[in-house]
């Protein structure tokens, strides 16, 4: 069977910005027969995420991410439907997901590496398993729970950078749900600012591309900052940290502004900002959601419940077609998405 797949065509270089041309589509032949334990799947949706920038380097800089190899198929979060099965627990028509889904129209995968999902948890929106009811949702929820130290009724202010992205848009809402009295988002367009305040319930939004970020933050957070959900790093984070209160907490989710720079993770703070952090006893600990696998199942159920109750609003930016994986990735890395960036590979007619 001839299928299409996306391979890594070139590396952007350690300090280069990724472009769509770093990827290419090619035809590939799948084996005709399945081995015991394997399933053939048709890909429905694929995810592009900031962490993938690290996988484009020969050395990802982290021990839990393997680099993509040149001329080899790329992979990431994906969801699809089983078309044929030689696995005991999976049958034709089952919907399955994996963090290591190859960027292919169809694939033959080891059934043990797949997780069956229930469409009812997402009211039939299967792509949500790659966003709000999936890894970004868990990252936001567990990050806020484990590193935010929020206690309801204690009048805490939370700031979220990259607030209109996959994790940021959820983290701000979760901050409110868990008891923050004020949530402020930082993003890069007026349209995104309006989206945060009018649709997601953020109390205020700061556009870092217009005006002085520090001044806008002072106005939006008159009582200082108690919890900072950091998706971006760099100058924006320095401005936030400078306004954080004593004994406050940074949730170190991502550093998208630094992923194309050859620096260690998490990147060190400038000396003046690091001095503020130490003086005010601000925690800034590395957060890796994969260390909390025991919390995944209850986390997914909590996120699903909030979504069904209308308390957690979900936003996606959807591209179509495998040939647009590189375009979608480049756009996501430069803030072109609102909410989770997804690529629809094929529609499913059985839903």
UniProtKB/Swiss-Prot annotation:
Cellular location(s): Cytoplasm
Top EC category: oxidoreductase
Tissues expressing the protein: Widely expressed with highest levels in adipose tissues.
Keyword list, A-Z: Cytoplasm, Lipid metabolism, NADP, Oxidoreductase
Enzyme Commission no: 1.3.1.48
Gene Ontology cellular-component terms listed: cytosol; mitochondrion
Alphabetical GO biological process terms: prostaglandin metabolic process
Subunit structure: Monomer.
Function: Functions as 15-oxo-prostaglandin 13-reductase and acts on 15-keto-PGE1, 15-keto-PGE2, 15-keto-PGE1-alpha and 15-keto-PGE2-alpha with highest activity towards 15-keto-PGE2. Overexpression represses transcriptional activity of PPARG and inhibits adipocyte differentiation.
PANTHER family per record: PROSTAGLANDIN REDUCTASE (PTHR43205), PROSTAGLANDIN REDUCTASE 2 (PTHR43205:SF5)
Protein's recorded name: Prostaglandin reductase 2
Organism: Mus musculus (Mouse)
């Amino acid at each position: 069977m001839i299928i299409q797949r996306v391979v890594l065509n070139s590396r952007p270089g350690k300090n280069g910005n990724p472009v769509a041309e770093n990827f290419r589509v090619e035809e590939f032949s799948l084996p005709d027969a399945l081995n015991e334990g394997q399933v053939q799947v048709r890909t429905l949706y694929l995810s592009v995420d900031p962490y993938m920038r690290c996988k484009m380097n020969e050395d990802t800089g982290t021990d839990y991410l393997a680099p993509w190899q040149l001329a080899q198929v790329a992979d990431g979060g994906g969801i699809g439907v089983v078309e044929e099965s030689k696995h005991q627990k999976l049958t034709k028509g089952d919907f399955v997901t994996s963090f290591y889904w190859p960027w292919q129209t169809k694939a033959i995968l080891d059934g043990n590496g797949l997780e069956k999902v229930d469409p009812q948890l997402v009211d039939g929106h299967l792509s949500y398993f790659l966003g709000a009811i999936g890894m970004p949702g868990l990252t936001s929820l567990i990050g806020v729970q484990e590193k935010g130290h929020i206690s309801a009724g204690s009048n805490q202010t939370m700031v979220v950078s990259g607030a209109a992205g996959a994790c940021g848009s959820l983290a701000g809402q979760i901050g409110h749900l868990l008891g923050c009295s004020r949530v402020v988002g930082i993003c890069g367009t007026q349209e995104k600012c309006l989206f945060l305040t009018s649709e997601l319930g953020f109390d205020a939004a700061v556009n870092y591309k217009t005006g002085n970020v520090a001044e806008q933050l002072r106005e939006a957070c008159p009582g200082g900052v108690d919890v900072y959900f950091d998706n971006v790093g760099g100058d924006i984070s320095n401005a936030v940290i400078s306004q954080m209160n004593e004994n406050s907490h940074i949730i170190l989710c991502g550093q998208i502004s630094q992923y194309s720079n050859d620096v260690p993770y998490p990147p060190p703070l400038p000396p003046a900002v690091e001095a503020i952090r130490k003086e005010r006893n601000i925690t800034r600990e590395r957060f890796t959601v994969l260390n909390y696998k025991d919390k995944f199942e209850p986390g997914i159920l909590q996120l699903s419940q909030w979504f069904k109750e209308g308390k957690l609003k979900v936003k996606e930016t959807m591209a179509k077609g495998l040939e647009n994986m590189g375009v979608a990735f480049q756009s996501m890395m430069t803030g072109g998405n609102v909410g989770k960036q997804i690529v629809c590979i094929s529609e499913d007619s059985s839903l």
